[in-house]
């Protein structure tokens, strides 16, 4: 009588090789990314593991297709609707695994921050939430029509080595929006720079920075990377306080030095240290080659006028 066949899979991670059996066996790669013990009910931890294995085997599929039968599909929806299941429980195991991979890696690690928008079509969007208000064209009288999008916003920080190897998430924040009417008029009446950062949605950049450093514990190895939306003076101050680093695409040409010139004015006087060519797409979608000039200098940046007293 022959031995039963088992489908094996190999996975290499930082020089170690691990063998996992198929999802129905005793081990799976997902076991290294979750912590079933954080759930208040052991059955929730077991269901969470089974659900991840099924959805991992059908990435891009709907929940019914990934679950394959009605019993598993119903169990999946019950898990998501369970008030005892929190995002912190779901993510805690992955955060621990990210920290372990960070400690096993060497050298500088990039923490890429950005916001992702998930859009859904629902008969009752109020049960999910709203992400934004968009222009949907004009009516017969030429008036602009607007409608809100149903969905969820996720702001995350992804740890990546300088060789491009992803280590995992270090911070995640989920939210929806509730108010759009009158916000544009409100911006015309107040100076946004005078509003405390704690009262702005953009505080998520600072929250993720704190959470990431708190998880990894080695700020000197981290470089936080963000787009123009992260050009926030409070973020620069927090980065300095936490003894870490950042790379941000500048949106505002801030005052620098003694206040009689800007950052760009000061950098224009710096010699070019090198050139870097990248390929991007123009407004027509055609690929073009762009040459970037590399200049480096330590610059003293002044706070916005509305925040100089704080």
Give short role names for the model-derived ranges.
Residues 2-310:
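Conserved, well-structured functional cores that handle cations and Mg-NTP chemistry
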